[in-house]
Protein backbone atom coordinates (compact mmCIF):
# COMPACT_ATOMS: atom_id res chain seq x y z
CA UNK A 1 0.00 0.00 0.00
CA UNK A 2 2.92 2.38 0.62
CA UNK A 3 3.90 2.35 -3.06
CA UNK A 4 0.36 3.27 -4.10
CA UNK A 5 0.29 6.09 -1.54
CA UNK A 6 3.64 7.40 -2.80
CA UNK A 7 2.48 7.26 -6.42
CA UNK A 8 -0.79 9.03 -5.60
CA UNK A 9 1.12 11.73 -3.72
CA UNK A 10 3.47 12.21 -6.69
CA UNK A 11 0.53 12.58 -9.06
CA UNK A 12 -1.40 15.05 -6.90
CA UNK A 13 1.36 17.14 -5.30
CA UNK A 14 4.53 18.98 -6.26
CA UNK A 15 7.21 20.53 -4.09
CA UNK A 16 7.77 24.25 -3.86
CA UNK A 17 11.25 25.22 -2.68
CA UNK A 18 11.34 28.09 -0.19
CA UNK A 19 14.53 30.15 -0.48
CA UNK A 20 15.48 32.70 2.14
CA UNK A 21 17.34 35.63 0.62
CA UNK A 22 15.94 38.78 2.25
CA UNK A 23 18.42 39.00 5.13
CA UNK A 24 21.06 36.41 4.19
CA UNK A 25 24.41 36.89 2.47
CA UNK A 26 23.48 34.23 -0.08
CA UNK A 27 20.13 32.63 -1.00
CA UNK A 28 19.52 29.44 0.98
CA UNK A 29 16.86 26.78 0.44
CA UNK A 30 15.25 26.29 3.85
CA UNK A 31 12.28 24.06 3.01
CA UNK A 32 10.27 22.11 0.50
CA UNK A 33 6.51 22.55 0.82
CA UNK A 34 4.04 20.11 -0.71
CA UNK A 35 1.41 21.95 -2.77
CA UNK A 36 -1.45 20.54 -4.79
CA UNK A 37 -0.67 20.50 -8.51
CA UNK A 38 -4.17 21.69 -9.43
CA UNK A 39 -3.86 24.96 -7.48
CA UNK A 40 -3.18 28.25 -9.24
CA UNK A 41 0.37 29.61 -9.01
CA UNK A 42 -0.84 32.32 -6.61
CA UNK A 43 -2.45 29.70 -4.35
CA UNK A 44 0.74 27.60 -4.38
CA UNK A 45 2.82 30.65 -3.44
CA UNK A 46 0.40 31.57 -0.66
CA UNK A 47 0.49 28.04 0.74
CA UNK A 48 4.31 27.96 0.71
CA UNK A 49 4.45 31.36 2.44
CA UNK A 50 1.90 30.49 5.13
CA UNK A 51 3.39 27.06 5.84
CA UNK A 52 6.85 28.59 6.39
CA UNK A 53 5.66 31.14 8.93
CA UNK A 54 5.51 30.34 12.64
CA UNK A 55 2.05 31.04 14.02
CA UNK A 56 1.13 28.58 16.80
CA UNK A 57 4.22 26.39 16.42
CA UNK A 58 7.57 26.40 14.66
CA UNK A 59 6.84 26.40 10.92
CA UNK A 60 9.09 23.39 10.20
CA UNK A 61 6.65 21.26 12.24
CA UNK A 62 3.83 22.00 9.77
CA UNK A 63 2.41 19.09 7.80
CA UNK A 64 3.74 18.92 4.25
CA UNK A 65 6.93 20.83 5.07
CA UNK A 66 10.39 19.28 4.73
CA UNK A 67 13.03 21.16 6.71
CA UNK A 68 16.21 21.79 4.70
CA UNK A 69 18.15 24.06 7.05
CA UNK A 70 20.84 23.04 9.53
CA UNK A 71 20.43 23.77 13.20
CA UNK A 72 17.50 24.01 15.52
CA UNK A 73 15.71 27.09 14.24
CA UNK A 74 15.07 29.24 11.19
CA UNK A 75 13.22 32.51 10.72
CA UNK A 76 9.85 32.70 9.00
CA UNK A 77 9.57 33.52 5.31
CA UNK A 78 9.49 37.28 4.68
CA UNK A 79 9.26 39.84 1.91
CA UNK A 80 12.37 39.53 -0.24
CA UNK A 81 12.51 35.74 0.04
CA UNK A 82 11.72 33.49 -2.93
CA UNK A 83 9.67 30.41 -3.82
CA UNK A 84 10.64 28.12 -6.67
CA UNK A 85 7.77 26.30 -8.39
CA UNK A 86 8.88 24.10 -11.25
CA UNK A 87 11.50 26.15 -13.10
CA UNK A 88 10.12 29.57 -12.13
CA UNK A 89 11.32 31.57 -9.13
CA UNK A 90 8.95 34.08 -7.52
CA UNK A 91 9.98 36.84 -5.10
CA UNK A 92 7.81 37.50 -2.04
CA UNK A 93 6.89 41.15 -2.37
CA UNK A 94 3.52 41.67 -0.71
Model regions and ranges:
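Short, basic/aromatic beta-hairpin or loop at an interaction surface
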Residues: 35-66
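Generic signature of intrinsically disordered, low-complexity segments enriched in small/polar residues
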Residues: 16, 23-26, 35, 52, ...
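Alpha-helical structural elements
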Residues: 8, 18, 27, 44, ...
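A conserved acidic, glycine/proline-rich C-terminal tail/linker
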Residues: 60-73, 78
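Short, compact, well-ordered microdomains
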Residues: 73-94
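N-terminal disorder-to-order initiation segments that are Gly/Lys/Arg-biased
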Residues: 1-41
Amino acid sequence: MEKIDALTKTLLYEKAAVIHAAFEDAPTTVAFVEVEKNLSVDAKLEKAFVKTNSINDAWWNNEGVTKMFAGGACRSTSMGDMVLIGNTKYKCDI
